[in-house]
Amino acid sequence: MKKGINRVVLVGTGAVGCSYAYCMINQAVAEEFVLVDVNEAKAEGEAMDLSHAVPFAPAPTRVWKGSYEDCKDADLVVITAGLPQKPGETRLDLVEKNAKIFKQIVRSIMDSGFDGIFLIATNPVDILTYVTWKESGLPKERVIGSGTTLDSARFRYMLGEYFNIGPHNIHAYIIGEHGDTELPVWSHVSVGIQKLQTLLEKDNTYNQEDLDKIFINVRDAAYHIIERKGATYYGIGMSLLRVTKAILNDENSVLTVSAYLEGQYGQKDVYIGVPAVLNRGGVREILEVELSEDEELKFDHSVQVLKETMAPVL
């Protein structure tokens, strides 16, 4: 790794990977950006196309089609490779197929001498982040999944639409599995400086029934998009960009990534979406918010589903 030069390697040049790559070049987040794919011609074509966007970016990025050997000097390796979710298929349905692919990818990356941070986006992301941690042997804080960052963004966007407040001023988190058992932390939602419960009590224009419908739309958003256009990629591309910036810029920002629990929230030995502080070292710490009794039960259920699903592939 050259001094002052950030290198990011992207493994997987499908729709998600390329959406992320475009975001990275557009905002000039890293000085070096490497694309790796089993389809080398695709990776080369994407690198060529992206490099032609560099003159319009705020700062130069060197982009090229590389190999796993390029991971040796990488600060961050982002994996989006794997089989995509099909219409009617849950993220957990993908587990056995993508776990096998992942084990091979991670071994190849580690054989290069890689000693940076992993960021995983392939579904089921919580389980594949765990697989990456196990296969890599890296410290838990340097293996991170995209978790519920996108779900939390969808949540804030839809709540913002409902309350007619910009999403940057909606403070709300989705935690748990990135999938069907995720849950909203209603007890800690605030709109601007007002707690959600206070707002509901003050203004009968708003009600919990509407809010519950909003969460269902958040949870099922991927299904709705896949039914209409076949895949989701812009939202997750921006989510990965946000996590990347938090890490490379040493921001100490709080994002709901998939992080390893060892006692937090009463759970152990699982990667799952929780609020975590991210900086140049990866996950600095996991923030434990006090959950309501109902939220605690739902979170425990989410953990249980993940553990049962990943048992056969470990």
Swiss-Prot record:
The gene is ldh1. Substrate binds at residues 85, 91, 123-126, 151-154, 232. Homotetramer. The active site is at residue 178. Allosterically activated by fructose 1,6-bisphosphate (FBP). This is L-lactate dehydrogenase 1. SUPFAM superfamilies: LDH C-terminal domain-like, NAD(P)-binding Rossmann-fold domains. GO terms for cellular component: cytoplasm. One of its GO terms (biological process) is glycolytic process. It catalyses: (S)-lactate + NAD(+) = pyruvate + NADH + H(+). It comes from Bacillus anthracis. Keywords: Allosteric enzyme, Cytoplasm, NAD, Oxidoreductase, Phosphoprotein. NAD(+) binds at residues 16, 37, 42, 68, 82-83, 121-123, 146. Gene3D superfamilies: Lactate dehydrogenase/glycoside hydrolase, family 4, C-terminal, NAD(P)-binding Rossmann-like Domain. The modification Phosphotyrosine is found at residue 223. GO terms for molecular function: L-lactate dehydrogenase activity. InterPro entries: L-lactate/malate_DH (IPR001557), L-lactate_DH (IPR011304), L-lactate_DH_AS (IPR018177), Lactate/malate_DH_C (IPR022383), Lactate/malate_DH_N (IPR001236), Lactate_DH/Glyco_Ohase_4_C (IPR015955), NAD(P)-bd_dom_sf (IPR036291). The keyword Cytoplasm applies.
